[in-house]
Amino acid sequence: MYLLILFLPLLGSLISGFGGRWLGCRGTNTFSTLCVVVSSLFSLLAFFEIGLTNTTCTIFLVSWIKSGAFYVSWGFLFDSLTVTMLVVITLVSSLVHIYSIKYMENDPHQPRFMSYLEIFTFFMLILVTADNLIQMFLGWEGVGLASYLLINFWYTRLAANQSAIKALIVNRVGDFGLSLGIFLIFWVFNSVDYSVIFSLVPLFDNQFLTFLGFKLHVLTLISLFLFIGAIGKSAQLGLHTWLPDAMEGPTPVSALIHAATMVTAGVFLMIRFSPLLEFSPTILFILITFGSLTAFFAAVTGVFQHDLKRVIAYSTCSQLGYMIFSCGMSCYDVSLFHLANHAFFKALLFLSAGSVIHAVSNEQDMRRMGSLLKFMPLTYSVMLIGTLALIGFPFLTGFYSKDFILELTQISSYSNLQMSYISFACWLGTMSVFFTSFYSFRLIYLTFLNNTNLAKSSLNLVHESSLLMIFPLIILSIGSIFAGYLIRDLFVGSGSDFWGAAIFILPKHSTFIEAEELPIVVKWLPFILSLLGIFFASFVQIFLKTFYFKSNLQNLLSFFTFLINKKWYWDVLYNRLIVLPILNFGYSISFKILDRGFIELSGPYGFTKFVSFWSQILIKLQTGQITHYLFFMIFTFCSFSIILVYSYINLTFNLLLLFFTLFFFI
C-alpha cells in the first residue's frame, strides 16, 4: 500500500505522457485522476495507521550506491511527518486533477498537462518519503524540473518561457546551497542517512572547522547551507522573485505549486532537520529574521498588485514567511500545522481565481472586473471563505494556526529571548496581518462587489463554472472551515505525542505553556488588526475611491507605489549586479574571442599549422650537399660540448665553495 502511494502517480504520468495519443483526452483524464485519487485514499489509510498509532514504517527496496563509506539505498521512511505531508500533497493534487479536467478541456495538449501534474506529484512524494539526503535531493531536483515544465506549459508564449527559466535559475542558487550542505554532512557524519545523522548530531555540538582563518561551528554551517536551499524553494526574501512570475502557467499549476508542492518543500526540509537546527541558535535567529521580513515584505507588496493571481501569490509568500518564522522559534509542529491548513485555503483561493478567470475570458486584471457576485454567487461564497481563512478569521482553519504562530511570536518577544531585534521581527509578523486583510478584501471588492469595467459583450458571457470545477471548490471550502478545528488538538494540542520522534525540540526552546500567560490584549491583537484591515479596505473601496483619484494623495504615494510595483527593484538589482556583468563577460570573452577562433587556433587547427610551419623550415635544411651536413654536425657537437663544459665548471665551483665553507666553519 505504501509503495502504491508513491508509484501510482508515476504510472499515471507515464501512461498519460506516452499513451495520451491513443487514450485521448477523456481516457487520459480518467486514468490520471483515478491514479491520484487512489493514492490519496491510501495516504489517508497510512495517516490513520502510522500517525494515529505513533509508529514508524521503513521500507528498503534496493542498494543504490556503494563506494567505500558512501552507501545510499532506495528506501522510504513513513512517520507522522511523512504521512501528514502525503495527505496534503495527494488530496490537493487529486482535487486539482479533477478541476483541470474541465478547466483545460479546450487545450489540445491536455494529456501532456496531466502527465506533468502527476510527475510533479510523484517527485514531491519522493522528496517527503526519502530516508536519505541523496534520494531527497533527487525528489528536490525533480520538483524543480516539473515546475519548469508546468510553468512553461504554454511554451509558445514568451512570458511563460521567461518565467520558467527564471524559476529554474533562481532555484539553482538554492539547490547549490543544499548540495553544499549534503557534501558537508557526509564529510562530518560519514553518512547521508537520516537516522545516522540525527543520532550523531549531539556529539558534534562543540565541533568547529577552520576555513580561510575563520573558526566556524560545524552544525551552524550545515544548517546555513540547508536553509539556503529552503530560501530558494520556499521563496524567502532574496530568492522570492520567481514566485510571482510563476503565475504564467495555467491556474491549476499555481494551485498545486503554492498549496501542496514546491514551495512547501523548503519548510518541510527545515522541519525534517529540526534535530540539527535545534543545536544552532544562530540559524534559529536567521530563520526568525528571514521569516518575519518575508511575511511583511510580501504582505505590503500584495497591497499594490492588480493581477488576481499575483495577489494570491504574494499571500503565499507571506504565509511561507510565517512558517519559516515558526521554525525559527522551534515551533516546528505549529509550522507544519499551518502548512496543512494553508494548503486548503490557498488551493481554494487559486482554484476560485481560476474559475473567475475562466468566466471572464482569461482576464486577470482585477480593475477590469467587478459586479461578478450576481453572476457567480457560488464562486464568490467559496472565495470569501478562503479569504476569511487566510486572514485568520475566528473559527476558520487559518485562525487556529496563524493566530497560534502570532501568539508564540509575542511569547518570544515577551519572555525567553528578550532581544530587541527579535521583538522587532515579532512585531513585523504581527503587522503583516493588517496588510493581509487589506489586500484580501481589496481583491473581493474589485472582483465581485465594485461596479464592473468589463465590456458588455464579455459580461454577457460570464457564468458559473461547471460541476467538475465547483466540486473541488466545495471540498476545499469545507476543509478551510473545519480542518483547523479538527486537527488542532492532534497536531499542537497540549500533551499530544502525535509527532513522536519525527520532530525534535530542545526542552529549553518549548514555549507552548507560556502561551496561556499572555495578556488578553496581545491575544486579541491579530483579530483586531484583521478587522482594521477589512474596515480600511471597505472604506477605501466604498468612500475613498473617487477621492483618491481626484486628490493629491496619489502624487504623495506615487513614488512608494512605483517602488513596490517594481518589486522593490529586486529584479533590477540582480540584473545590474549579476546578470549583465555575466552577459558582458560572455560577449567580450566567449563570443568575441573563444567563439571566433581562439579554441580552434590553440586546438587542432593551431596544432596542424604549427607542425606545417616547422616542417617547412626543416625541409629547407635538406639541401643534399655534404658540406652543409658537416657544418650542422660540427655546430651541434660544439654546442653540446660548451653546455657540458659549462655544467662541469659550474659543478666544480659549487663543490669548491661547499668545501671552503665547511672547512672554515668546522
Curated annotation (Swiss-Prot):
Protein EC: 7.1.1.2
Topology in the lipid bilayer: Multi-pass membrane protein
Organism lineage: Eukaryota, Rhodophyta, Florideophyceae, Rhodymeniophycidae, Gigartinales
Main location: mitochondrion
Record-linked NCBIfam families: NDH_I_L, PRK06590.1
Similarity comment text for this entry: Belongs to the complex I subunit 5 family.
GO molecular function (one): NADH dehydrogenase (ubiquinone) activity
Transmembrane segments: 3-23, 31-51, 59-78, 82-101, 119-139, 168-190, 211-231, 251-271, 283-303, 311-333, 337-357, 375-395, 421-441, 467-487, 524-544, 572-594, 629-649
Catalytic activity: a ubiquinone + NADH + 5 H(+)(in) = a ubiquinol + NAD(+) + 4 H(+)(out)
Keywords: Electron transport, Membrane, Mitochondrion, Mitochondrion inner membrane, NAD, Respiratory chain, Translocase, Transmembrane, Transmembrane helix, Transport, Ubiquinone
Database matches in InterPro entries: NADH_DH_su5_C (IPR010934), NADHpl_OxRdtase_5_subgr (IPR018393), ND/Mrp_TM (IPR001750), NU5C-like (IPR003945), Proton_antipo_N (IPR001516)
Function noted in UniProt: Core subunit of the mitochondrial membrane respiratory chain NADH dehydrogenase (Complex I) that is believed to belong to the minimal assembly required for catalysis. Complex I functions in the transfer of electrons from NADH to the respiratory chain. The immediate electron acceptor for the enzyme is believed to be ubiquinone.
Keyword Lipid biosynthesis attached: no
Pfam name, any one: Proton_antipo_M
Protein name: NADH-ubiquinone oxidoreductase chain 5
Gene Ontology terms: biological process: ATP synthesis coupled electron transport; electron transport coupled proton transport
